[in-house]
Amino acid sequence: MRKRIIAVGVVLLIVGLASSLQAGGVINKQNLSADYLRTLNRNAATDMADAAVYNPAGTAMMQDGLYMKADVIYLMKDYSNQLPSAIGPLALTGGTLDSDEPSIIPGLFAVYKQDRWSVFFDVTIPGGGGEVKYNDGNARTTMLSLPTPFGGLGTYLGGPTGNPNNIDQSIEADSYYVGYSLGGAFKIFDSLSLGGGVRYVDAYQEFKGKARGAANSVDVKIERTDEAFNYFLGLDWAPIRDLNIGLTYMSNTKLNFKADTTDTSPGDAISRSVGWADGTHEREDLPGYVGVGVSYFIIPGTLRIEPNLTYYLEQQAKLEGAR
């Protein structure tokens, strides 16, 4: 009788934000599971349920049984904007504006393996997954609060003396692209398996900002949403004992965001300046990628190397917005 395994992993991982942990594309995120943050390589994984997203074909190489895994990734972030002490003849207070709002990124993975086939399901955050909150505004709100001769709304907000020094500002934003994947894999030979499936992406972005001056105030809220399907394919090859190679192709996800906007600035000036006036559409795809991973035991069962490469196909995506 084959050994049956039920693996249930619930991981709460608290990490500091570093560039390596957030590695990905312009929009894509690679930190889809806690085990990726722990190892920084999962493209050839055949050991845990998150193989469903990193190496879907490799799920057919796992031992028979049910594998389940739930992750909650808590990322501590510290972003800052350094402001100038002056813009031309206009003196500013300068200094640094900070946001230390953490990000909470969930992940859910399930794999069922039987004989030569497997089925899997996962919920991940393949894009976005972040939140910022600048209680005193940031560089953008500072520029928007400049006096009218400098191209801002400072005169409207604060009267003749209105400028960033005497206008209260704040801005916050969050973005989550939730991906739901369903697929399967089949072991053609003992050394080769193929897999694939479909992914549904529900993308959401929200931006909220406000400014208060002696004369007027401005409130802006922008929600951008869209949803789409894409597909993925995978191959897993184990040519010799202790060596495994995983290959995954994720197709481009076409997203055409629609803006739902409330803007009290004169003539909707703020939302129009970024191209997100109410009802407007903007293509901003979630690019596809090719992931390759190698896992090799130098010393069987003791020492293993796992080089990984993920190449994002951003040239094939349509990105109309300025990034």
Where are these predicted regions, by residue range?
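Preference for bulky hydrophobic residues occupying beta-strand positions
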Residues: 15, 70-72, 198, 307
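Hydrophobic alpha-helical membrane context
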Residues: 15-16, 67, 211
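N-terminal, post-signal peptide beta-strand-biased segments of exported outer-membrane/organellar beta-barrel
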Residues: 19-127
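Short, intrinsically disordered low-complexity segments
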Residues: 1-3, 68, 198, 240
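Outer-membrane beta-barrel porins/channels
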Residues: 24-38, 42, 47, 105-107, ...
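Short intrinsically disordered, low-complexity coil segments enriched in acidic
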Residues: 1, 6-7, 89-94, 272, ...
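Cleavable N-terminal export/targeting peptides
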Residues: 1-30
